[in-house]
Amino acid sequence: VARGDVKLNPSQNAAMEAAMSRRLTIIQGPPGTGKTHTAVATLAQLAREGRGPILATAESNVAVDNLLEGLLNTGVRAVRIGRPVKVRETLRAATLDAQLEDHPKQDEIAIIRDETDEVHRALPKLKGREKGLAHRDIQRNKKEIRRLENEMIQSVLENAEVICSTNIGSGHRMLDGRRFPIVLMDEATQAVE
């Protein structure tokens, strides 16, 4: 039915079809009936249809990791925001932090940091105007690093079909101004707010 051939039983398939065709859908059922499995299949299908970017959330880190793992197994480009130490070890490569570490702009940032360190080391020997110019260069470099880091974050998020986060994490400032035509909340009954 979805990318990666996620197999659904008839009731799961009906739930997925409802979720894809209605503005709001609640899927409920006892534990172990495949609600998360259905959520993953739905997200994969929506991603395949290009209906993103999609925000997928859950109250707990474990539940978010389950969504992320299912999405990655179906070939969806998903990224996990949040603290990497809270993410299952096998999924860390899909975290925003891990993808930023491997980003091509890191080389440019390293050069600027080296240059800034060099200026810092020279500061005690400088006086007057030279010292003022050195401080200006340090501030300029810090600003450039922040700009590059923000560009990296935006490029990773823009490349993702699905952004996964805890409910609390979905309020992070890095998502400010970002519009999600589709939001899926797994285990919504556990949400505190």
Q: What is each residue range found by the language model?
A:
Residues 25-26, 55:
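Short hydrophobic/aromatic beta-strand immediately N-terminal to the Walker A/P-loop
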Residues 9, 57-58:
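Active-site-adjacent beta-strand anchor residues
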Residues 5-23, 38, 165:
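N-terminal pre-P-loop "Q-motif" helix
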Residues 36-44:
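Motif I (Walker A/P-loop) of helicase-class P-loop NTPases
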Residues 187-188:
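Walker B catalytic acidic pair
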Residues 32:
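Walker A (P-loop) phosphate-binding loop of P-loop NTPases
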Residues 1, 44, 50-57, 63-183:
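Conserved P-loop NTPase motor core of helicases/translocases
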